[in-house]
Regions:
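Sec/Tat-exported extracytoplasmic proteins
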Residues: 1-4, 32-39, 55-66, 76, ...
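VWA/integrin I-like adhesion module and closely mimicked acidic/polar interface patches used
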Residues: 42-46, 60, 69-71, 78-142
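C-terminal signal-anchor/stop-transfer transmembrane helix together with its immediate cytosolic
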Residues: 169-209
Length: 209
């Protein structure tokens, strides 16, 4: 889907836009790869899990769009414990703006390695992990989306493929020529903001086989 506008919001105890909406997916990928799992431990962002703030940040990027399909994909491995906006309040706001939220709980309940700042530098310790599936299901239901559970990389890939099939919008392409050069004018068909809890790459994704 090379013509989709995609943005990236990351969150821990607070949320910010890592990449605004863009069709330049190479730039998006570079910014995604630049995320460091210990960003909270280095004091660059408040620690915790602010799901509501993450959704609200994505809404602010999507709410004025005239696109037929406006989607947020919320990816998290925990439960909300920070932020001024509750996840369900954020879901109601998304609904008002016609934004559908697909929620994905990744990993398994139990423990997972988490980066901690020590006198010797950042070290990983096992901390309890519990996915709030009830809240994630409610967020999806409120916005006419779906909740998915991904316990492996292969399952996560399947989830994204299913969402891709659900979010199909007819694309009208106009072609015109000038000085014997052909151009394609692509319509913007979907805005997708992927919310990524910043610890995923160094916690959950480490334990997923």
């Amino acid at each position: 889907r090379p013509n989709d506008n995609i943005g990236l919001t990351i969150f821990a105890g607070e949320a910010f836009t890592q990449c605004p909406l863009t069709v330049d997916h190479g730039v998006l990928l570079n910014l995604f790869n630049g995320i460091k799992g210990d960003i909270a431990q280095r004091g660059l962002i408040e620690d915790g899990t602010a799901i509501g703030m993450g959704v609200a940040n994505a809404i602010s990027r999507l709410k004025d769009s005239k696109a037929k399909s406006k989607v947020i994909i919320l990816l998290t491995d925990g439960s909300n414990n920070r932020g001024d906006i509750s996840p369900l309040t954020a879901a109601e706001i998304a609904k008002q703006f016609g934004i559908r939220v697909y929620t994905i709980g990744v990993g398994t309940n139990g423990t997972a390695p988490y980066p901690m700042q020590t006198y010797a530098g950042v070290q990983y310790v096992n901390v309890p992990v519990e996915i709030d599936e009830q809240t994630l299901t409610q967020i999806a239901g409120t916005t006419n989306g779906n909740y998915y559970r991904a316990t492996s990389n292969s399952k996560l890939k399947e989830v994204y493929e299913e969402i891709d099939k659900l979010e199909k919008t007819k694309l009208n392409v106009k072609e015109f020529s000038k000085r014997e050069e052909a151009y394609q004018l692509y319509a913007l068909i979907a805005f997708i903001c992927i919310l990524l809890e910043i610890v995923l790459r160094n916690t959950v994704l480490k334990k997923i086989p």
